[in-house]
């Protein structure tokens, strides 16, 4: 029996590519099911991505499911210098 061991970066990339395709908020349990891992492991991957700023978590509310979503890519703002006359 071959055990499929992926690195942390491979797991995170898999999460990002899968959920950028469906483009809707997702639950930890959905990530766990997609990756074939426990909810605890999925939460670990999601928290790593959150720390990197690649995804964001819904505000924590008592009794509500945590939803995750891909962070919007923000472009750096362009500064223009004013030239004095």
From Swiss-Prot:
Q: Which SUPFAM superfamilies match?
A: Winged helix' DNA-binding domain
Q: Which Gene3D superfamilies match?
A: Winged helix-like DNA-binding domain superfamily/Winged helix DNA-binding domain
Show the coiled coil region(s): none
Kindly state which keywords UniProt assigns to this record, in alphabetical order. Answer: Plasmid, Transcription, Transcription regulation
Specify whether 4Fe-4S is a keyword of the entry: no
UniProt GO BP: regulation of DNA-templated transcription
Q: Which InterPro entries match?
A: FaeA, WH-like_DNA-bd_sf, WH_DNA-bd_sf
Please indicate which superkingdom the organism of origin belongs to. Bacteria
Q: What does this protein do?
A: May have a possible regulatory function on the expression of the other AFA-III genes.
Q: Which family is this protein grouped under?
A: To E.coli PapI and DaaF.
Protein name from the UniProt record: Dr hemagglutinin AFA-III operon regulatory protein AfaF
Q: Which organism is it from?
A: Escherichia coli
């Amino acid at each position: 029996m071959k055990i499929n061991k992926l690195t942390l970066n491979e797991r995170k990339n898999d999460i990002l590519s899968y959920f950028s395709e469906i483009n809707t908020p997702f639950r930890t349990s959905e990530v766990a099911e997609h990756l074939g891992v426990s909810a605890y492991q999925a939460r670990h991957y999601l928290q790593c991505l959150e720390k990197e700023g690649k995804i964001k978590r819904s505000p924590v509310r008592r009794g509500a499911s945590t939803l995750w979503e891909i962070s919007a890519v923000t472009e750096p703002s362009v500064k223009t210098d004013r030239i004095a006359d």
